């Protein structure tokens, strides 16, 4: 945690995990995602993610304003990519179905459902 206004939890974080898609995104259905972000219990957060395919292709996304807690619907935006995902744009949503935060260890664990969205690749 970052020493900020009393009663307001602020901190930076890193998240990483598998994104397994039911429908392919640019011909790919399995990614490893890594994200960095700033979380503010009063204002939400700002997150930047890189989704990497097994072949090394990347999709870049931005998430903002949503707290990391169960039941929250997250809205994301694709802002580019590499390889077959170069120039990818679009939006997506998902819902946190379970979350666990261990502030002492600086760990977050979460699971999502209902990942859906639309995209364009030039």
Map each language-model feature to its residues.
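Beta-strand-enriched cores of mature, soluble protein domains
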Residues: 1-122
